[in-house]
Amino acid sequence: MYYIGIDLGTSAVKLLLMQGDGQIANIVSREYPIAFPHPGWSEQNPADWWDAVCAGIPELLNGFDASQVAGIGAGGQMHGLVVLDAQDKVIRPCILWNDGRTQKQVEYLNNVIGKENLSKYTANIAFAGFTAPKLLWMRDTEPENFTKISKIMLPKDYINYKLTGVHCTDYSDASGMLLLDVQHKCWSKEMLDICGVSEAKMPKLFESWEAVGTLTAEAAAKLGLPEGVKVCAGAGDNAAAAVGCGAVGNGKCNISLGTSGTVFITSSTFGVDKQNALHSFDHADGGYHLMGCILSAASCNKWWMEDILNTQDFGKEQEPITAEKLGANDVYYLPYLMGERSPHNDPAARGSFIGLRMDSTRADMTQAVLEGVAFAIKDCVEIARAQGVEIASSTLCGGGAKSPLWREIMANILGIPLALPQTEQGPGYGGAMLAAVACGEYATVQECADKLIKIKSVTEPDPALVKKYAARYELWHKLYPTLKPLYAEMEALQ
């Protein structure tokens, strides 16, 4: 049997066809636009996602027996607010995870409602990208649209709705809304009341591997699939990527270098970071996880290469960064191009190059970008370690993980071995794995991961470089608090 995995990303949907034994039979990608109607805003039209899926799946199945497809599972960009009216029509464009317009609402939630109360209700505090502040923004700024809301969902849930006609979500994705009681796996009445929405407007909750329904006749006809194909609830992209990299069960870590960057630490028991600098979410395997998220990771390198250096030859730009330059770069980079989430929770934060001199080179700045992202990931790792969480090794996924140089820099800055899974399709592969569990191909997510996940290579840290980078990190770590007062002034002048 075949299983379709959907990776609903920020810039494109990636679709993969997985055999029951885990082999990837085909991969297709379809891009769609992203709109920035105002500085700091970020939106997409949900219809563009669905159109991309409808165009991509027939292409994915070309040359394969569609009758052998048993299930579909999606991993999707988290936190985006999708709102439907009583006729299930989209009311307004989706406000995405990297949208920073909700600073006022975040301040209200954290300072008026209070971080302690938020943590009690949801195990988390408010961040600009979360869904609840977006609902408050709609209520404050677009009251006519807010009153039309009949259903609230997340990006991948809209795809599942179009596939099955069911309004649903899973616990891992719902955890990032600031509307879910993460510990008890139910909607928080307190948060729904604060946001002015009833539970009837919220999607039904499922475990990620549970089937939410089967394809409707209309969806099956559009996709060229039989109506009996099961659709599982799927997961938020980070949880799906963790499944696709084998980070399931207790005490595993997965680091993702995608558009954003994440540190994902699994646990069989519920726990909250004392400072709420890390997210405490449900995992797609039925357990829990702590997660740190930096808003700009591989997107920093893409911005630097394509927008500033006007090149797409990433490998050539990295060639001058030789071994002796590692741990010896005097140029530092703060990767806050979209503000920052973990650990600073500061939508006003800005990206910066610091330490430039007349003899600084293009390669120094390229190296600084790679190192700055790794230092920001280390910020999250160190917070987890301070809570007593042991992180002895990690898997690594995402577009940035394809760079051997970046893997080497990351391993030495973090001081741990980094394992690269055989498949590079983390969220999509995880989605297909969850679909395989939903269809009974595997009994549990753990069994599926144990049988399917293979490691391609491991990057080991060099003790001498670990020591050099530790000193550089201590200096880098002081830069944000030094510049923080200026970010608010920059915001005021905008």
Features from the language model and the residues they span:
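N-terminal glycine/serine-rich phosphate-binding loop of ATP-dependent small-molecule kinases
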Residues: M1-R92, K120, K148, A220-A221, ...
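Active-site core segments that coordinate phosphate-bearing ligands/cofactors
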Residues: I4-G5, Q103, N110-F127, P133-C168, ...
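Residue-level signal for inorganic ion chemistry
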Residues: G22, N45, I72, D99, ...
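Structural signal for short hydrophobic segments within the conserved structured cores
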Residues: N26-R30, P203, S457
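Active-site donor-binding loop signature of nucleotide-sugar glycosyltransferases
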Residues: R30-Y32, E207, H283, P461
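Short beta-strand-loop/turn "lid" adjacent to the catalytic site in phosphate-handling enzymes
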Residues: P58-W97, I125-T131, N160-D181, K204-E207, ...
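A conserved beta-strand/loop element that lines the FAD pocket in flavoprotein oxidoreductases
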Residues: A200
